[in-house]
Amino acid sequence: MARSNVAKTLLNKQHAPFRSLNRRGDKFLFSIKSGLLALSQLGVFRPGKSFLAMMIILMVGLGLPATPAKASKYASIVIEEATGKVLFSRNADNLRYPASLTKIMTLYLLFEDIEAGRMTLKSRIPVSKKAAGRSPSKLYLKPGQSISAEQAIYALVTKSANDVATAIAEKLSGTERKFAKRMTRKAKALGMRRTVFMNASGLPNRRQKSTARDMAVLAVAMRRDFPQFYKYFSTQSFNWKGRKYGNHNKLLAKYSGTDGIKTGYINASGFNLVATVERNGVRLIGVVFGGKTSRSRDRHMMQILDNQFKRVKTITVRRAALAMPTTLPVAPPERGDKLPKSLPVSKTKTRPAAAPKKTEF
C-alpha cells in the first residue's frame, strides 16, 4: 500500500468515532433546540444566564466530558531493550498526559548539554521568580538562589521538583517556552511521533501529551545515549538544606533489578511510571499510564514485567535446547552434583551515539 494510502487509512480509523459522534450530535441538537424553545416559552430558560448550563447539557448529550477526563484504563507497554521487541502492549498509542515523566526529556537535554561541554555537573543554575513560583512538588527555591547541575539532577530524579525543572529550562534555552520547543524537536528526532511538550516539568497543560510507546522510546534513548549518567535514576534519596527527600519510584527498593527511571502524576493523568529492570542479563523497559493510585500502578507494572520475564526465560531456554548438539552423548550429573543456576553473561560497553537515533517498536 502506498504511503499516502496508509496515512489516509490511519486517519480514517482515528476520525471514525468523531464522525459517528457528529451523526448522533445532529439528532441530539434537534431535540435540544426543541426542548430549549419549550423551556423559554415557560420562562425556565434564559439564554443569557443559562448559557453555561445549556453547554453542559449539550456536552453530556453528545458524550463529551465537561472537563478533561481522567484516564479510566491503563496504557502500558513492555519491551526487551536488546532487541526492541514489544512483549506486551495495551493502549500503547493512546494519547495521555505524561505528567512528571516529562522530566525525563528535561534531563535528556541537560545531559546533552553537559556532554557537549556547554555545562558541567558543577555549573550553577540560577532560579528566577517564575521558576520559584512553580507549584509543588518542589524544593521551594527562592528567586536569586542557584543550584548546581548535579543537585538539579538529583532533585528531578527523587523529589521531581517543578521549580528546578523550570530553572533548568531557563538556563539551557533562555525561556521555558523555547525549551519546550526544543524538547518537542528532540522527541521527533528520537522517534517519539505523537509527543508534544509544553513545559519542562509536566505540570498540567492540555496540549502536552505523549504515549506509552513514545515514553519507551525515550527510555531506550536515555540509556543508549547517556549511559554515564544513567546511575542517577537509581538514586533512592537526596539531601537538600538538611532535609532528606526519598525517590517516588518505590520499585527501586521493592522490585529486584530495578535501576530507573521516573514516576509522574497529575489529576488528569493518573499515576504514571517508566521503569527499567534487568535480571539474568535480560533488560526490560516498562511504561504504565493511568494508575488510580501509586500502589495499584506499581502492582500493575510488576505484574506485566513478571509475566514478560517468564516469557523471555521460556523462549531463551527453548532456543538453547534447540541449539544443543544432539550427536554427542550427554552424561547426567553424578548424585550430589548441582548444576549452576545461571551462567555468567558477558556485557559489552557501547559508546553513546554522536547523534540521536530514531527508535521504532
Pin down the residues of each PLM region.
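Active-site-adjacent loops and short helices of periplasmic peptidoglycan-processing enzymes
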Residues: 2, 59-213, 220-223
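Generic detector of intrinsically disordered, low-complexity, polar/charged segments
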Residues: 22, 32, 40, 45, ...
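Alpha-helical protein-protein interaction elements
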Residues: 21-22, 37, 50, 54, ...
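Domain-terminus/edge residues, biased toward the C-terminal soluble/receptor-binding domains
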Residues: 192-196, 204-361
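N-terminal secretory targeting signals
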Residues: 1-75, 79-82, 87, 118-120, ...
